[in-house]
Amino acid sequence: MGEDELAAFEKSINEFGDKFRYRLSDNRSQVLGLKDAFKDSIRALSEKLSLKLKEEERMAEMILEYKNQLCKQNKLIQEKKDNVLKMIAEVKGKGQEVEVLTANIQDLKEEYARKKETISTANKANEERLKRLQKSADLYRDRLGLEIRKIPGDKLQFIFTSIDPKNPESPFMFSLSINEAKEYEVSDCSPHLECLAEFQEKVRKTNNFSAFLANVRKAFIAKVHN
């Protein structure tokens, strides 16, 4: 091989090395950008999921309140009905008074029917909204890899997946309940997180549940990479 051919060969090798290093650097920048975008997406979706969960809790409380109101109305109407029937028995034979009392009973029945219909309509509307919220929660669950289950002991179990890139289906979980002091109580964390107690105290003070979920997920991710 002559000197000119050797020089041309060395030049080709250098050009190939420069192109390879440039592409490697460019690909690394793209990967880092995608990683940051993914983290932002996860954080935003976690916050939306928290809002949906809070709305579900409010809807459940409203439905319970409506049911309690209906029970109270039923009891009140029954008491009034009993009183009216007692009065009818006392004035039996007095046609005019009986007619008045009968009209009162009819009014009470109509009032009860109206209130029952109002509460029933509100319950149906709330149930439909809960279905929509559950559908949204399922969508966020699929995107975030987060599943929420109700387990014995009045607890909710939060199960994260897509944490470990090598094993996306591997579950990372913890349980949550409300103690007698009306505070969040976190337990049964797997794998164990040293920082979980700190996260628990913070969510008790701030009541920012979406931030709590985001912090726990980040801690699980960090544990995998460490």
Swiss-Prot record:
The keyword Ubl conjugation does not apply. It holds the Pfam family Spindle_Spc25. Residues 1-58 are annotated as: Interaction with the NDC80-NUF2 subcomplex. Residues 89-147 form a coiled coil. Keywords: Cell cycle, Cell division, Centromere, Chromosome, Coiled coil, Kinetochore, Mitosis, Nucleus, Phosphoprotein. The keyword Hydrolase does not apply. Transmembrane segments: none annotated. It is found in: Nucleus; Chromosome, Centromere, Kinetochore. It comes from the Eukaryota. One of its GO terms (biological process) is cell division. One of its GO terms (cellular component) is nucleus. Residues 1-146 are annotated as: Interaction with the N-terminus of SPBC24. InterPro entries: Spc25 (IPR045143), Spc25_C (IPR013255). The modification Phosphoserine is found at residue 12. Residues 147-226 are annotated as: Interaction with the C-terminus of SPBC24. Belongs to the SPC25 family. Acts as a component of the essential kinetochore-associated NDC80 complex, which is required for chromosome segregation and spindle checkpoint activity. Required for kinetochore integrity and the organization of stable microtubule binding sites in the outer plate of the kinetochore. The NDC80 complex synergistically enhances the affinity of the SKA1 complex for microtubules and may allow the NDC80 complex to track depolymerizing microtubules. Component of the NDC80 complex, which consists of NDC80/HEC1, CDCA1, SPBC24 and SPBC25. The NDC80 complex is formed by two subcomplexes composed of NDC80/HEC1-CDCA1 and SPBC24-SPBC25. Each subcomplex is formed by parallel interactions through the coiled-coil domains of individual subunits. Formation of a tetrameric complex is mediated by interactions between the C-terminal regions of both subunits of the NDC80/HEC1-CDCA1 subcomplex and the N-terminal regions of both subunits of the SPBC24-SPBC25 complex. This is Kinetochore protein Spc25.
